[in-house]
């Protein structure tokens, strides 16, 4: 993996673009296949905290791995589970009440579009997303129970570094790509 190094001045000249971990500059509202990089997705999701930080640090990457584990049956289904929140690597995570507010239609559309591009770039069948939703909802209920309910402390939250590593291990084990 070759990382792109730029100066602060070069970064300033790229208004409207987001710099990724690997040094790419992307427009998150207009992603294309060349923008998508699994290392960026893993790194970004491992540094985004679920539940707007209300609980312990628990990354979107760790959540995504656990959803993937629930989506067993086929590699494509598990891969769709792993990548169901991948658009958040470029758009960030929003709390569900905010994301689903009437005024957030443009965000939801951007997230859907980014998901389609990511799935296309990584060869994942987007038809699995509806089935993944059931397991995502199940994981949400488990997470609430682990952090604030009857099973507080039952989940060991990973560091961002561990979550990133585990995310990439899961991705490469499902795709057979190294």
Language model: regions and residue ranges:
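Metal-dependent phosphohydrolase cores
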Residues: 1-178
